[in-house]
Amino acid sequence: PHRPQDLNLAVSGQMVILGMHRSGTSSVGGLLKLLGAWPGEDERLLRGADNPRGHFELADLHMACVRRLQAVGADWRNPLAESSAAATDAFRREAALILQTLESRRPWFIKEPRLCLLARELLPLLTRPVFLHVIRDPVAVAASLAKRDGMPADEALALWEHYTREAFAASDGWPRLTIDYDALRSNPIAVTRKLHSELSALG
């Protein structure tokens, strides 16, 4: 994929939210929508009992990520490091069609926790994206995963670390911001103003 230094361009109005499951990425997606960014048509957005307010996540992108991991025998709880050219190519082809549907409404954003593992494979499809990393206390993430999925704490903490490392490695060198979910919950106005200011500064 291309590298940041290959693109001497202004930020393009493409945003990618990255964060581990149960880290507050849906809250940040809702916030971006309030700030004027587009997640796609409402009828295309994923909804579930675990997040009745909505995930602000394209259902077809979610399924593309699921299929990409399944293609190499992986899933969100068992994200194998192995890849294959065929799996990557199939994922990029599917993702390209999905992203094209957003292009008429910049600024737009995408989110799916599995993108922490797959964002690097999207880079050839993006112009000059901004990555928004959503960070939550890993102990709180583990507690949430235990409640939702019955996941043991040691597994949840190891998974949080893996997703977080992969996400920051994927965005290395690109425009990126970090959003503290706990700070957003405790002081939403200040965090929202800060996010708006930082995004405005990026163009």
What are these regions (language model features)?
Residues 1-92:
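PAPS-dependent sulfotransferase catalytic core
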Residues 70, 74, 96-203:
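PAPS-dependent sulfotransferase catalytic domain
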